[in-house]
Amino acid sequence: MGSYLEEQYNRDFNDGKISLENFDTKKAYETGTSPFKQAIAEEFKQYNTNSEFIDEINSFKNMLLKTQIILTTNYDTFIEDNYNSTSQYKITKYVGQKGFFCNTYGYAELFKIHGSVDLPNTIVITEEDYNNFDKNSILISSKIISTLINSPIVFIGYSLTDKNIRKIINNFTSQLDSTERKYLEDRIILIEYKKGESTLIEETINDNDLGCELKVIKTENFKYVFDTIAKINQGIAPTEIRKYQHIIKKLIIDKGK
């Protein structure tokens, strides 16, 4: 469907039937940007927060400060905007496959694996985009596995029926032996939205296709989830760790000269 929509939209754009502010056929040609993806980027650049969820958003901000690595399939800048408005240290952002080949610090980092509104052509929306994403999804799995060594992984707002989540989980479970898989099962949690459920329903699901058991928490009360994670005492914030890691790395490099 995405491929069809892009084809139709770009055709109408080139024929002058559709226009975009500050973006014309010349700019599309010079930058190699798909008008369809440009339109999506412009749409998701703007967002409004519902006053009804202010308390939940504040809890979300506090939770973000406890995270080491964040992976998201969202195009918008909601996560980085809220993180940076709360922390004196900015989160480091990687878009698409960028960062998976880099020697990153592993703290206060955001990986936007389906692209970002800042870079319209990185947006994953067409069949070709998803095929390319699937080919490189093992990189995401490698990043998750390296993170699991030190910290648990929490999927928030996704479902086990989500194709992307299943692909990511399957990629790394298929590479593990039974002992390693058991270690994984104790450290991965999926928090799934369940309308009308104010409490937390915890289940352990044995998924034969994924080849592992998963802890699944179902709830509508995400504020409670955010508050609980925010209470974790790490001793020092991930942003602080990244700051000092950079200093230590620089000292080691300078010492080696």
Give the predicted meaning of each segment.
Residues I54, E128-K143, N171:
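Active-site glycine-rich loop that binds ribose-phosphate moieties when present
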Residues V154-S159:
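Glycine-rich adenosine-cofactor-binding loop
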Residues M1-I123, K143, I149, L160-I168, ...:
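Conserved catalytic-core helix/loop/strand module for nucleotide-ribose chemistry
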